[in-house]
Regions:
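Glycine-rich oxoanion-binding loops at beta->alpha junctions
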Residues: 40, 49-80, 228
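C-terminal non-catalytic interaction/assembly regions of soluble proteins
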Residues: 226, 232-265
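Internal, active-site/partner-interface "lid" segment
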Residues: 123-132, 142-205
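Gly-rich Lys/Arg/Thr-decorated short loops/hinges at beta-loop-alpha junctions or inter-strand turns
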Residues: 27-35, 44-57, 122-125, 196-212, ...
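Short, acidic/small-residue loops that bind anionic groups at enzyme active sites
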Residues: 56-61, 105-132
Length: 265
C-alpha cells in the first residue's frame, strides 16, 4: 500500500481542498490551523504535527487559500475545546480565514478564534498587507501556541499565549535576487549583481532600500540593529532571545549557517 510508504503516515492530504492535516484529530484539545499561499515550504504544511498545527491550508503559489478551503479545514479539525486560526497579515489571508471562521461559527456552531501575525518591521504597509507583514515569526507562534494547546489549555489562554508571542517577535528580510513566480515567468524586480534588496517581502515585493552587497557580518549587524531598534519590541540588557534565520525557501543551508554565525556574534 502506497500510504504505508509515506514519509509522514501520521498525516493526510485532503486533495480536493488542498489541506494537510493530522490523520487523528484530538477532540479534547484546542486545534490550530494556519496556511497561506504555496511556494514558501516548509510553511505551512511542514509544521503540521504533535505540539504544532493540526492542519495547514495550501493556496496556489503566492495566492491565499480560498474561504471554502479554510472552512473545510476548520470542519475537519473541529474540537470540543475550539479552534485557533493563526493568520499571517496579508489581505487575502485575513479576509478568507476570517470569513471561513465566521461561517463555521454560524453554520456549524464551532468555537473559532484567530490571531494575526505581523512580525516584519521592514514596512508598515505593502501591496499584499494592511500594516506589517507576517513572515518567519509565524513559526514561533505555531510552536509556542501549539505547546499550550498540547498541555490542554483552553481557547482563550491559547490565544493569549499566541498573542504574547506576536507582541514579542520582530523580523527583517533581504534578498540578493528576485524570485520568479511560475505564473509570471520573469523576476518581479531587477537587482544588479553588486546590490541587495533590504526589507524584501516573501512574495518578492521590493524592499525599503537597495544597498551595495556587504559581507555576512556587516549584513547581520544591519539586520540585528533594525530588528532591535523598532516600535514593536524593546530589548534591554539581560533579555533572553530566540533567533531564527529563515531562508525564504531559496537560500542554501550552508549560507543560512554562515549568516546564523554572524547573527550570533
Amino acid at each position: 500500500d502506497v500510504y504505508k510508504r509515506q514519509a509522514h503516515p501520521e498525516l493526510e492530504f485532503v486533495e480536493k481542498f488542498k489541506v494537510v492535516k493530522k490523520k487523528e484529530i484530538n477532540r479534547d484539545k484546542v486545534t490550530l490551523i494556519s496556511g497561506g499561499g504555496s511556494g514558501h515550504e516548509p510553511a505551512h504544511a511542514g509544521f503540521v504535527g504533535k505540539g504544532m498545527l493540526d492542519a495547514a491550508v495550501c493556496g496556489d503559489v503566492f495566492a491565499s487559500p480560498s474561504q471554502i478551503q479554510v472552512y473545510e479545514a476548520i470542519k475537519a479539525t473541529a474540537s470540543d475545546k475550539g479552534t485557533l486560526l493563526i493568520i499571517k497579515n496579508y489581505s487575502g489571508d485575513c479576509m478568507n480565514f476570517n470569513n471561513a471562521g465566521a461561517r463555521a461559527k454560524e453554520d456549524d456552531d464551532i468555537n473559532v478564534d484567530a490571531v494575526f501575525v505581523n512580525d516584519d518591521v521592514a514596512v508598515t504597509d505593502s501591496l499584499y498587507t494592511v500594516g506589517r507583514r507576517g513572515v518567519a515569526g509565524t513559526m514561533f507562534v505555531h510552536k509556542i501556541a501549539g505547546a499550550a494547546a498540547e498541555q490542554g489549555k483552553d481557547l482563550p489562554e491559547v490565544k493569549r499565549i499566541a498573542q504574547k508571542v506576536i507582541d514579542n517577535v520582530a523580523s527583517i528580510g533581504f534578498a540578493i535576487s528576485s524570485c520568479t513566480p511560475p505564473a509570471k515567468g520573469t523576476p518581479i524586480f531587477e537587482l544588479a549583481d553588486e546590490n541587495m534588496e533590504f526589507g524584501v517581502g516573501i512574495h518578492g515585493e521590493p524592499g525599503v532600500a537597495t544597498e551595495k552587497f556587504v559581507t555576512s557580518d556587516e549584513l547581520a549587524e544591519k539586520m540585528v540593529a533594525r530588528v532591535k531598534d523598532n516600535a514593536v519590541i524593546q530589548l534591554k540588557a539581560g533579555d533572553e532571545i530566540a533567533v531564527i534565520v529563515n531562508g525564504f525557501g531559496g537560500t542554501p543551508l550552508s549560507e543560512i549557517y554562515v549568516l546564523n554565525t554572524s547573527v550570533n556574534k
